Regions:
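Short, acidic (Asp/Glu-rich) active-site segment that either coordinates a divalent metal cofactor
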Residues: 180-225, 260
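Compositionally biased, low-complexity linear motifs
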Residues: 36-51, 265-278
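Glycine-rich phosphate/pyrophosphate-binding loop regions near the starts of catalytic domains
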Residues: 40-201
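A generic structural signal for residues located within well-ordered alpha-helices
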Residues: 26, 30, 95, 206, ...
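Residue-level detector of flexible, active-site-proximal loop/helix-junction positions
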Residues: 35, 67, 80, 157, ...
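Acidic/polar, glycine-rich intrinsically disordered N-terminal extensions of enzymes
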Residues: 18-45
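Glycine-/charge-enriched secondary-structure boundary and capping motifs
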Residues: 3-6, 12, 16-25, 130-149, ...
């Protein structure tokens, strides 16, 4: 058959062509083979509460035993334009971890235990190469790090819509559970409470429209700064341990909007504010490179990037030092970066 553009007129009967789904760009057999390839990755995440097999119309899971008044907590997110750079540089596994992290880190801010994760992947073809399999393997890794099951997902072939070779779009959905009496909602926060910042793994998954603009203008080469694509750190295990030891009053996942916009979301009422000392930690060098190459104002840097702080806790001053020591014992760097003040 002569190669044609998608919108060229074509009389199938006159040309003697029998149209099928594969000719239109979707190979059902390849899709079934892909499902078989990812089964081991998916099953490696399953918790004892998972019910049923793999590949059904839905996923089922029991609420773990021990909860008296369980409250379900849900969140959804993507990886933004970081996904485009990850595609270009073959970081498919890492972007899978990113996807889980962006959802899980949001869900745990109220004290929830992550239960299960769902993914949505849109790609031109599932059989072009191993990249979509690598992506799912990364998602499974993120789920194992989070302690949640990869309960299901959808991989859709969009041959006419995603014309760039190997490009894909992804979204994730996470559900967790928390005991109603143990919800961390910020209601106990008072002036003088301390803000502890926990190190990020670099840029994480926000600010990439600005970063990509710098790459388009040849000011930054990703090949010179591979740490730009480091996956977002997952804080679920750390937070799970800390909340058993210390009275955590509030938590924030530092994403788009940086510290100035995410920390105030912890505050329970009017009359309170956040005071941050930006000199209290050393920001990773990559942020200095971005600021210098783009001539970005400091205020803009603070509103766009995490600047090296990926997650924050608000604790009473009497447990500040012990909390910092405990975080260090888990292998993370952390600093007291500010406090709660009267507005």
């Amino acid at each position: 058959m002569t190669e044609r553009n998608w919108d060229d007129p074509l009389d199938f009967k006159e040309e003697g062509i029998e149209l099928d789904y594969k000719l239109a760009g979707v190979d059902i057999d390849a899709g079934n083979y892909f499902v078989e390839k990812i089964k081991p990755h998916v099953k490696s995440t399953h918790r004892p509460e998972v019910m049923g097999g793999f590949g059904g119309f839905n996923g089922m899971m029991r609420i773990p035993s021990g909860y008296q008044s369980p409250i379900l907590v849900s969140g959804t997110d993507g990886v933004g334009t970081k996904g485009k750079l990850a595609t270009l540089f073959g970081r498919d596994y890492d972007i899978g971890i990113d996807l889980v992290a962006m959802c899980v880190n949001d869900v745990i801010t109220c004290g929830a235990e992550p239960l299960y994760f769902l993914d949505y992947i849109s790609c031109p073809k599932v059989d072009d190469n191993k990249r979509i399999t690598e992506l799912v393997a990364g998602i499974a890794d993120g789920c194992r790090q989070s302690g949640c099951a990869l309960l299901g997902g959808e991989t859709a072939e969009h041959p006419q819509d995603l014309a760039v070779p190997n490009e894909y779009d992804i979204a994730g959905f996470c559900t967790g559970v928390v005991e109603e009496s143990e919800i961390i909602d910020g209601k106990l926060i008072n002036p003088g409470d301390k803000i502890i910042g926990i190190e990020s793994n670099g840029v994480h998954a926000n600010g990439f429209s600005l970063i990509r603009y710098l790459t388009f203008r040849h000011q930054i080469k990703v090949s010179d700064h591979p740490d730009l694509l480091n996956p977002t750190r997952i804080y679920a295990s750390l937070v799970s341990d800390l909340k058993k030891e210390f009275p955590i009053l509030g938590m924030a996942h530092i994403t788009g909007g940086g510290l100035p916009e995410n920390l105030p979301r912890c505050l329970p009422r009017k009359g309170l504010d956040i005071k941050i000392d930006y000199s209290s930690w050393k920001r990773p060098d990559i942020f200095n490179v971005i600021q210098d190459k783009g001539n970005v104002k400091e205020e803009e840097m603070r509103r766009v990037f995490n600047l090296g702080i990926g997650y924050c806790l608000i604790v009473p001053p009497e447990v500040e030092v012990d909390t910092l020591l405990a975080i260090d014992g888990h292998g993370y760097k952390s600093w007291t970066i500010g406090e709660v003040v009267l507005e």
